[in-house]
Amino acid sequence: MKTDYKVGELIYDANIYDRLNTFLSDLQFYKKWLPTNKEARILELCCGTGRLTIPIAQEGYNICGVDYTPSMLEQAKWKATEAGLEINFIEADIRTLDLQEKFDFIFIPFNSIHHLYRNEDLFKALACVRNHLK
């Protein structure tokens, strides 16, 4: 039996996610790895509601966010607009990602990588990361 692991809508409600994930204590960890050139293209995979995407964009970085869950992206877009930011948020599966562009830096925050349940899914996602790096 072949199983589609699209569980995003079952596990995450954007409003609940934002209420449970109000912390930004990990932001400094991610920021220390960002390129020094703020014009560098940054891609955040599994960006959710923009918990990290938005503060990084507020620092002047050129960042794009990808997520699988429409409700998360809707919330991220709303929050970015409220913050006066123009961020490109894209609905896509990181296992089959094909944005037709390259990035200087790509990261997957928090525990999102654990949603890739099978090794083949992890390898597909990592191959997509490789294909999108400059």
Name these PLM-found stretches:
Residues T53-T96:
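Class I SAM-dependent methyltransferase SAM/SAH-binding core
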Residues D104-E120:
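A short SAM/SAH-binding and catalytic strip from SAM-dependent methyltransferases
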Residues M1-G48:
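Conserved class I S-adenosyl-L-methionine
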Residues P35, Y117, K134:
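Short conserved AdoMet
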